[in-house]
């Protein structure tokens, strides 16, 4: 769980650092995810017919899952746009998935560059936020690192990604 800036939320062992989680032994563990904005965005649209969590690291797989679901319309929820940042890391992800869905050229490096050059990406490069290591930025900008989508299911009051 994380709060703005990537710090671990009270009661959570980890913050919002993918690099820190790479070394964590989580096999067989239930993982509860809480981000500064992404989880709230999912909650806000919990009643959508189909809901996916997405990022550049699984963009192509997400586009394939959307296509397989036969969606006539797709709505992208941009949660990274705040008063102090442009949110282009989220917009780049949406633009990438949209280009794939439309069959348009989608050069991975163009979208990765947008993540690195976004307001939030520059915070990682600056090195002034202890819970925003540069390794996280490189992981976030690794387009199509994973070949799975993250469909979100409703289980009672909870949203679950499996």
Set out the residue ranges of the language-model regions.
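A short aromatic-anchored loop/beta-hairpin motif
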Residues: 1-6
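Short alpha-helices
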Residues: 36-39, 43-104
